[in-house]
Amino acid sequence: MSQSATRNFCIIAHIDHGKSTLADRLIEMTGTLRHDEMCEQVMDSMELERERGITIKAKAIRLRYLSKDSHEYRLNLIDTPGHVDFSYEVSRTIAACEGAILVIDATQGIQAQTLANVYLAIEYNLEIIPVINKIDLPGADIPRVMGEIKSVLGYDEDAVIQISAKLGLGVPELLEAIVARVPAPKGDGKLPLRALIFDSHYDPYKGVVAYLRVADGNINKGDDLRLMGQGTEFKVLEAGYFAPAQVAALRLDVGDVGYVATGLKSVGECRVGDTVTLQHGGAIQPLIGYHPAKAMVFAGIYPTQTDDYHELREAMEKLSLNDASLSYEPESSPLLGHGFRCGFLGLLHLDIIVERLEREFNLSLVVTSPGVSLTVTRTSGEVLTVVNPNEMPLPHEIASIEEPWVSVVIITPSKYIGTVMDLVRENYGVYKNTEYLGQLAMSELGQRVQLHYDMPLRSILTTFHDQLKSRTQGYASLDYEFVGYRIANLSKIDVLVNDVAVDAFSRIIPPDKAHEIGEALVKKLKEMIPRQLYQVTLQAAIGSKIVARADISAKRKDVIAKCYGGDITRKRKLLDKQKEGKKKMRQIGKVEVPKEAFLSVLKLQ
């Protein structure tokens, strides 16, 4: 099929706005799959994706479409994740397309992550087709959403297509708009090969299978190729396209979206966003879009049963074959045994990895409190990267600490501006500006407002998103983007049990929250640690300064039970002997901290 009859497009949307359902309708209405072959969320092949209703990895499928004027077109649809953690996956998918369908929920309107993805599409010069979905729902407010689209994105009513992806309403008109408005791929088949990798997965028989878009030249089975960013070389074992299963083809031409089987042993050798070219006589200039995805959130993962460490290690190795953005290295803790310090793109990424480890590999896990990567400069001038609180130098050895900051966009009804501003202020946010989303965007909750802040990444890591939803009754949405490192005033708080620090309870906090967090930690531990035969002292400390304390009183054995009446000095002697014994026990005794205590402390944010 000619290059002029090819259309490459993606679907971008906020999470749960109906992106995967629309992909299903496009597949069904173009006859790519028969009705009996269809299942809900065809593009979401991972069980976890279907269950949570989210897209985690980018997918691609080739559709054949016969337009109303009887011309046949090849439509390459690339599905993208909608969650902020996977924004890098969205960016490289967008780089592989000429057009984007922007899906907006008729009941919710424009959300923060919708805007982030739109700006990305504009940056890559994509033709955007705005679509209002879920028009069949009773809560649909089409005039309001249309007003938002016009005021925020600048599209007239005529350019917006109204659909119900669930019922298929308006989808035929959308297909016509795709062939009419999305430009054909440019590229030159005579130039040296350049193809952009937008995803990959590991196949036990074919090695790494790279999903790519051919920008110039073509790919044939048996070609010797090279990755321009990493320098990795491989031979094409198989090339083909997705329908949605892999279908082998003789070659991939300029503008095509398909796959190549590389025979490589790990997705780390075939990074997403890299440019593929020929080993001999290849291109000189790579395509845009490659920068390695960087882990932003770190947490320790340990098996509940220490015997399961080897199973956990094997599971981590298998998961990392398909997820180049997951980093891990072994670490050990006196309380939790052997485990791994892992790096993730964000909290959802962490959540998904833990759920996959537990579900697919049948492991029971303990996950430590998530933190960020800090840059610490010692007084000696040495610069350290600290991802584990226990790696933090002593306070007098630290010259400065830098932490990652993010630019945050919150969209909320104006009714909740005050509560949102209070929440952000409590979490060390710095206000930048406010924008109103158009005069027509009115409802009983007031006009919708876009608030811009800079915030430390650690502030939004734990319960910030839940608190935002709770304080705005679920109406607010959030998007954030890494903007760099800034000087931070942070300290490590330790928990001491009978003067011995327990490493698993250490965390890095702002000093002004030390008393509040310290009190909460020792109070929770006091509830969870069983009483011993001697007094147990729990302390929270920053360096040598104690900021909170609680005591667990000793169990007392009745040593004078057998003394009936008689001389009081005999009783005193027995009680003094008991007191001496307890003093000695406290010096040499080891308090067993149960894992339940650790888990309950973890839930304290």
Swiss-Prot record:
An example Gene Ontology molecular-function term: translation elongation factor activity
InterPro entries in alphabetical order: EF-4, EFG_III/V, EFG_V-like, G_TR_CS, LepA_C_sf, LepA_CTD, LepA_IV, P-loop_NTPase
Listed Pfam families: EFG_C, GTP_EFTU, LepA_C
Keyword line: Cell membrane, GTP-binding, Hydrolase, Membrane, Nucleotide-binding, Protein biosynthesis
Coiled-coil stretches: none
Ranges of residues in domain tr-type G: 4-186
Function: Required for accurate and efficient protein synthesis under certain stress conditions. May act as a fidelity factor of the translation reaction, by catalyzing a one-codon backward translocation of tRNAs on improperly translocated ribosomes. Back-translocation proceeds from a post-translocation (POST) complex to a pre-translocation (PRE) complex, thus giving elongation factor G a second chance to translocate the tRNAs correctly. Binds to ribosomes in a GTP-dependent manner.
Protein name as annotated: Elongation factor 4
Name of the gene: lepA
